[in-house]
């Protein structure tokens, strides 16, 4: 399972750990992903999505129905 938010498309980024002595080592910044079940009233069922916390806020703002329409338009099976 890839580390990608299904709503926002956030992916891991790469950067550096920087020590006090200014030594740099490569690291990954991972998105804050959660497997979350959302109740879809119109379909009378739960939908499981892998979303970041930013994606959860977008779902709270727009509603799960609008987000699912957008995901299905992109070709994701939900």
From Swiss-Prot:
It holds the Pfam family Ribosomal_L28. InterPro entries: Ribosomal_bL28 (IPR026569), Ribosomal_bL28/bL31-like_sf (IPR034704), Ribosomal_bL28_bact-type (IPR001383), Ribosomal_bL28_sf (IPR037147). Keywords: Ribonucleoprotein, Ribosomal protein. It comes from the Bacteria. One of its GO terms (cellular component) is cytosolic large ribosomal subunit. Coiled coil: none annotated. GO terms for biological process: translation. One of its GO terms (molecular function) is structural constituent of ribosome. Belongs to the bacterial ribosomal protein bL28 family. This is Large ribosomal subunit protein bL28. It comes from Psychrobacter arcticus (strain DSM 17307 / VKM B-2377 / 273-4). The lineage of its organism: Bacteria, Pseudomonadati, Pseudomonadota, Gammaproteobacteria, Moraxellales. The gene is rpmB.
């Amino acid at each position: 399972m890839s580390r990608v938010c299904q709503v926002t498309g956030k992916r891991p980024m790469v950067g550096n750990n920087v020590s006090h002595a200014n030594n740099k080592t490569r690291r990954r910044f991972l998105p804050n992903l959660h497997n979350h079940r959302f109740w879809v009233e119109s379909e009378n069922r739960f939908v499981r999505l892998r979303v970041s916390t930013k994606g959860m806020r977008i779902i709270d703002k727009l509603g799960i129905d609008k987000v699912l329409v957008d995901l299905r338009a992109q070709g994701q099976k939900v």
